[in-house]
């Protein structure tokens, strides 16, 4: 592969998926320092991507605006124009779906590659890269596409730089909530998009009480109405109320809260993966997804899998109407924490 000057990455959402793809941009810059990296992303992960110093240009793709004919006619041509302002030496479709294939189709490039498991006919546009990690962790699968265009991957680096002003605002929010600089605290990620990725609120509450007895403060994080409701349920079930930061921070401030914590605990969801990306000790509670593919990168030994024969089913909601992660008792998590030292 010749020198790369312009590379387009298509990885649209969600937060955890975008985090997993960040090392690809680092690998490109590490191998081709003068390369310009453009990334197409959807609004939910925009502020996360802005913290990536390895991305030179961000193109925003707002899928919602394309759902009506009027919206499509208004948005398509400006988006296409921005996408085609330059040609690319390579296009890497790390989403592997119809919507990302459509973006790759309109991008001007002779080399279009995708991940090993392309879906929705996206492999008709971008050639799947079936590398040595095709059965491995999703981070390594993404990196196989970088290797395919000549990138050396000497180490896996998640390039994330939190703006100083956002860290300062996060500190102020935390202090106002009762967490002073230097106070030890752990982060509970209370929700997840998939219902069966959520640990029961009574379990979080019991674990929070256990931490308080160790003089460690539990901090609840999340966003949206559902996470707010879950956090209130946890609060109501605890002996001492936790620090509740749900809906109190933006993504960049949340990143500071996570990076400064002693431990992050939650299901297979974006903020938990962010903890692993920062190298913070991370315990991931897993049911419908696979540890080897989706566990906390670099800390797979800290994942706790549910003891069910159907684990790794990849279903958003349990067809048996069972609460998947309730089979992970609080005592399992406490023992895992003790084993971490």
For the regions a language model picked out, list residue spans one by one.
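Catalytic machinery of carbohydrate-active enzymes
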Residues: 1-341
């Amino acid at each position: 592969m010749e020198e790369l000057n312009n590379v387009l990455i298509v990885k649209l959402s969600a937060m955890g998926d975008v985090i997993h793809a960040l090392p690809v941009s680092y690998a490109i810059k590490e191998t081709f320092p003068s390369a310009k990296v453009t990334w197409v992303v959807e609004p939910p992960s925009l502020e996360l991507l802005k913290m990536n110093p390895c991305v030179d240009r961000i193109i925003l793709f707002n899928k919602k605006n394309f759902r009506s004919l009027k919206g499509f006619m208004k948005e398509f041509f400006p988006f296409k124009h921005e996408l085609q302002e330059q040609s690319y030496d390579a296009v890497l479709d790390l989403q592997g779906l119809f919507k990302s294939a459509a973006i790759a189709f309109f991008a001007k490039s002779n080399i279009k590659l995708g991940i090993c498991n392309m879906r929705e006919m996206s492999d008709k546009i971008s050639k799947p890269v079936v590398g040595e990690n095709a059965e491995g962790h999703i981070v390594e699968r993404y990196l196989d596409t970088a290797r395919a265009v000549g990138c050396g991957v000497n180490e896996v680096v998640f390039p994330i730089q939190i703006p100083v002003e956002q860290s300062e605002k996060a500190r102020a929010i935390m202090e106002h909530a009762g967490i002073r600089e230097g106070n030890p605290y752990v982060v509970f990620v209370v929700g997840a998009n998939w219902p069966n990725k959520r640990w029961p609120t009574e379990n979080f509450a019991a674990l929070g009480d256990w931490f308080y007895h160790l003089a460690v403060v539990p901090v609840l994080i999340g966003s949206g109405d559902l996470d707010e409701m879950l956090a209130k349920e946890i609060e109501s079930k605890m002996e001492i109320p936790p620090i509740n930061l749900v809906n109190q921070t933006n993504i960049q401030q949340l990143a500071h809260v996570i990076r400064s914590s002693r431990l992050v605990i939650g299901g297979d969801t974006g903020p938990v993966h962010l903890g692993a990306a920062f190298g913070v000790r991370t315990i991931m509670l897993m049911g419908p997804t696979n540890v080897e593919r989706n566990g906390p990168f670099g800390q797979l030994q800290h994942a706790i899998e549910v003891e069910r024969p159907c684990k790794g089913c990849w279903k958003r909601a349990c067809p048996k109407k069972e609460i998947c992660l309730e089979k992970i008792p609080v005592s399992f998590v406490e023992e895992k924490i003790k084993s971490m030292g």
